[in-house]
Amino acid sequence: MRSKLREVDETDITRAIFSRAAREWADFTESDVIVVGAGPAGLAAAMYLARYGFKTVIFERRLSFGGGIGGGGMMFHKLVIQSPADEILREVKCKVEPLTEGVFTADTAEMIAKLAAGAIDAGTKIVPGIVVDDVMFRDTPLRVTGAVVQWTSVTMAGLHVDPLGVKAQAVVDCTGHDAEVLAIVSRKIPELNIVVPGEKSMWSPEAEKLMLKNTGEVCPGLYVAGMAAAALYQTPRMGPVFGGMLLSGKKIADVVTEKCRALVPRRKQSRRSNVA
C-alpha cells in the first residue's frame, strides 16, 4: 500500500459529492419501498425487503442509525434478544450470548453495525439527516403514494423551505415511540380515520406479543412496524428487549411483499451496484 496520499483538489471533492449524491437521489426518487427510521425494526425490514428484490430506501432523521439500540438499557451497552429473533442477528453475524434457554444478550454497537451492514449489503440505501415532513397521497382510490422529505437541519432551524417528494408503493413507519408518519397522516388526511393515542406503560411480555400482532398495513400504501405500532394501537412499551422489534421488521417485509407483489415487478435479487 502506498504511504503517500494522492492529492485531491477542493473543487474536485465538491464536484464528486454533488454529482454522485444527485445521481443517487435521482434514482431513489421513485422507489418501491420507503422505510422511515433506521432503528431495529426499520433496518430489519429494509434488509429483508431489499433481499426480496424491492428497491428500498431508509430515511433517518439523525446523522447516525440504530434508533434505540445504542442506548441499550439505561445506557448500559447490552440488550436482550429472545428466540427466534436471535436468528436474524446470526444471519448478519452479530454475536449473541446465551442467558437462559431462548434468551440472549447482544452488544449494542455490534448490533447497530451488523444490522446496518446487512441492510446495505442487501441493497438498501440509507440516507441520514432526512426527516419525513409529510406524505404524498391520491384519492381515487385513497392511498399513500410516497413521502415528502426535508433536511433535518432545515426543520430544526425553522426555515421556510419547501420539501421534495419521493414516490413509493409502500411507506413503512418505523419511527418508534412518536409514530411520526402516522401522526402526520392522522392530522392531514382525516378521512383515513387514523388516531395515534400513544403507547401504554411498560409490560414487556405483553408488549412484545401485541406489537408483533399489530405490525401490518394501516391503509393502502402505509404500513407500521416496531414501537410505532404500539403508539398506534396503544399497547404497552417493552423496554430494552429487542426480539419483537426485529421480528416486527421481518414481518412487515413479508406483509409488504404480499401486498405489493402485483404492483411492483420482482427484481433480481442482487446487490445494488457500488458507486465507483
Predicted segments with their positions:
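Extreme N-terminal leader/targeting segments of oxidoreductases
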Residues: 1-33, 118, 151, 198-204, ...
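N-terminal Rossmann-like FAD-binding beta1-loop-alpha1 element of flavoenzymes
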Residues: 26-57, 245, 253, 257
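Short hydrophobic core segments
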Residues: 34-36, 59, 165-177
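Glycine-rich FAD pyrophosphate-binding loop
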Residues: 50-70
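N-terminal glycine-rich dinucleotide-binding loop that anchors FAD/FMN and/or NAD(P) in oxidoreductases
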Residues: 71-95
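Feature captures the FAD/FMN-dependent oxidoreductase FAD-binding
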Residues: 93-170
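Flavin (primarily FAD) binding-site architecture
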Residues: 173-189
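A conserved FAD-binding loop/helix module that cradles the flavin
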Residues: 229-264
